[in-house]
Amino acid sequence: MIAATPAKSKPSDVNLEQTFKGVSETSKIDLRRSRAAYRPLELSPTPSIFARNYQRNAVDFTGFFVLFWVAVSIMIFMSFLENFELTGRPVVGTIFKYFQSNLLDLAKADLAMSSMFLLAFPFQKIFALGYLRWYGLGVYLYSILILLFLSHCVLRCCLSNWSWTHRAMFILHSMVILMKLHSYNVVNGWYSYCYHSLNKLQSKKTDLDDDERSSVEFYEHCLNHHGNTYPENLTIPNALDFLFMPSLCYQLYYPRTAHVRIHYLIECALGTFGCIFLLVIISDHFMVPVLAKAIRTIIEAPEDASATYFAIRLGHTVAFLMFPFMLSFLLVFWVIFEGVCNFSAEITRFADRNFYDDWWNCWTWDQFARTWNKPVHYFLLRHVYVPLNSFMSKSLSTFFTFFVSSVLHELVMGCITLKIRGYGLFFQMTQIPYIIIQRQKFVRRHRLLGNIAFWFSIIIGIALIAALYILF
């Protein structure tokens, strides 16, 4: 039996009118919305943010900085977890044992070495009061004292029963104090000469001629900078201020910030210790095993092994060390210039935080020397290059400036490894012919190729020099 289906009633004219009216209103609303949604975008020829030879204002890369620290935290946590599963302790490793040994002895030695800087204050008071002249006996006496300080630092570092990590920290800090001592004494010695020369001219009873008046103006300009004058600057607080300041060049005036930001000090301290911890993890996991295997291979090498055999072993070791050493180099760079220097600058309210420029874009080695470590660059320029250039040509002054820098680098490596091999001296001096080649027109026209060559030399060079000092 089939049930009958009731017939549908036809809509009335009133319902049809209301229905079409609603559809019409909806169509009008959609039209207005679509006009706003599909109107043309305001497009213009704009390169990518990461495109070369283009700078976009107000581009914020803070997210990459946050990503880096998140990755660091994850890596540290994973290291803790792995160590705890294997040994039951979160922190293990050879490098951690090095850090824990002889810490008190290192602290005492470093404090004594740093305190020697304060002896420069009474030493310069002698010249300010006129008991001795700087350009005379003063320069010779200072040269003897600075050599004694350097000898003390080297002997204290090499003869102590310290690990290589302690030797590295001590000798690097010694080099910083050495440069600060030199700048403080040389600049204040020059001020003492200007001060006594000015007093001599002003005490003349006769009228000054034009040259003497020009000399008076010159000396007054040198001895007064933004209201800070010599010899009023020769005080213990001023010497301590320069000791803790992230500058290697002494002067009467430095720009200052309004106040010290405690939260920023905490941020710098946490970042520094986090990077140091990450450096330890990289060393223990990716450097020590490779170097231990290489040392074992060299010791167990057959007696008739040729130079080719050792060259292959060296190349194999360098290949496995390139990435961890490159990463360590970047972390050390951050620790020094973003962590330690900014912490020191914040404490002393030192306002000029331009400790480096965009050295990662360098396409010549002289660019790198000027931009990656600006405090040392300013020191070498002011206290080495300019004095040499007063009686030498520009090329000879540049050569000897590189030579002084290379000798200091070799001294640092010798104190850390307890070996004098000359690898650092040789490779740093080879930068001079590289610079000559990089200044040719072809390289200047193809800066990308220069930057690629720069990064290859950095990546290979750091691992190669480290492997040479450790293995041979």
Curated annotation (Swiss-Prot):
Keywords: Acyltransferase, Endoplasmic reticulum, Glycoprotein, Membrane, Phosphoprotein, Transferase, Transmembrane, Transmembrane helix. The modification Phosphoserine is found at S12. It comes from the Eukaryota. Its main location: endoplasmic reticulum. GO terms for molecular function: ergosterol O-acyltransferase activity. It is a multi-pass membrane protein. Its EC number is 2.3.1.-. The active site is at H409. The keyword Glycosyltransferase does not apply. The keyword Transmembrane helix applies. InterPro entries: MBOAT_fam, Oat_ACAT_DAG_ARE. GO terms for cellular component: cortical endoplasmic reticulum; endoplasmic reticulum membrane; perinuclear endoplasmic reticulum. Glycans are attached at N161, N233, N342. It is found in: Endoplasmic reticulum membrane. A motif (FYXDWWN motif) lies at residues 355-361. The chain crosses the membrane at residues 61-81, 111-131, 135-155, 170-190, 262-282, 317-337, 452-472. GO terms for biological process: ergosterol metabolic process; lipid droplet formation. Sterol O-acyltransferase that catalyzes the formation of stery esters. Belongs to the membrane-bound acyltransferase family. Sterol o-acyltransferase subfamily. This is Probable sterol O-acyltransferase 2. The lineage of its organism: Eukaryota, Fungi, Dikarya, Ascomycota, Taphrinomycotina.
